[in-house]
Amino acid sequence: MKKLSVALLVMLLAVSFVFANGAKEEAAPASDVFHVGIVTGTVSQSEDDLRGAEALIAEYGAVKDGGIIQHVTYPDNFMDEQETTIAVIVGLADDPLMKAVVVNQAVPGTTEAFRQIKEKRPDILCFAGESHEDIPVISTTADLVCNNDFVARGYLIIRTAHELGCDTFVHISFPRHMSYETMSRRVAIMKAACDEFGMKFVLETAPDPTSDVGVAGAQQYILEKVPAWIEQYGKNSAFFCTNDAHTEPLLKQLLQYGG
């Protein structure tokens, strides 16, 4: 889903430039040349995002090779290195051919980065994918904000779990994610949906991969806790986590122990 979101954003951008240039009868050759900045996490924090950027490079080429995609990554510990995150994003505006910057996921600091980009280069379009900052806030600087339909997903995920025969839904997250308005609202919807379908809703907490324990520590916690959770809640339980780094160890243990 994330790969598709990034790809659609850039395809939309490319088409818009083609039509814009086609409308100019006497357009200079240089007007057809533009670059697109793609900002993602690293493979350890959000592999899907990074692979999506690689797919775009494979299709449209990297700037260093004469293509249009300039891909950069923000730090794994982006919560503590917000200034670095901002600098990485804003640095893309130094390229005179840069016409759009897509940040996916739009982690904290993206709003400020877009503000600085607009100050120095108002011609650059700023796109935010899966915003970690409140949408009304990031919308003040972004030209387009794209998020999953978290309202519908809150209901549909529970309904699907019910249709699969689950009697318990275990939601795994941590305080940083739960502070996001989109995620807290989705949890409220999930709770209401569980009530509707007669399911038990459980909140479990796991370490934040951006904290001192890092990705490895967070994943180890999931590996160790899942067997106990399955024993506690039963094999008819559905498990859901809000962080990419938690997903792989969670799936691994569910395949081994059930659930």
Can you annotate each of these PLM segments?
Residues 1-34:
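Short, low-complexity disordered leader/linker segments with a strong preference
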Residues 32-34, 65, 96-100, 120-125, ...:
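Loop/turn elements at helix/coil->beta-strand transitions in domains of secreted/extracellular proteins
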Residues 32-86, 102-108:
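Extracytoplasmic "Venus flytrap"
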Residues 42-45, 106-110, 131-136, 175-179, ...:
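Solvent-exposed loop/turn segments at secondary-structure junctions
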Residues 53, 150-204:
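An alpha-beta-alpha
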Residues 60-81, 170, 191-215:
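Short beta-strand elements in bilobed, periplasmic/extracellular small-molecule ligand-binding domains
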Residues 100-126, 190, 210-259:
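Hydrophobic alpha-helical
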Residues 117-151:
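Flexible loop/hinge segments that line or gate small-molecule binding clefts
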